Amino acid sequence: MKINELSKLTAINTETIRMYRNLGFLHPEKLENGYYDYSMQDYASIIHLKKLRAFDFSL
């Protein structure tokens, strides 16, 4: 899925998703056109990160 779709599903803005990717928390496939394809595993990772943040864990 595209970053905008993932953003809508998780209620996390695209800049935060990019930061999570750059920090190595997400591992989307990079397509030939340069876009990233986020998987359901990336979705699950964001949900897990949201739970950690709710308990004041720092990233």
Report the location of each language-model feature.
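Basic helix-turn-helix/winged-helix DNA-binding cores
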Residues: 1-59
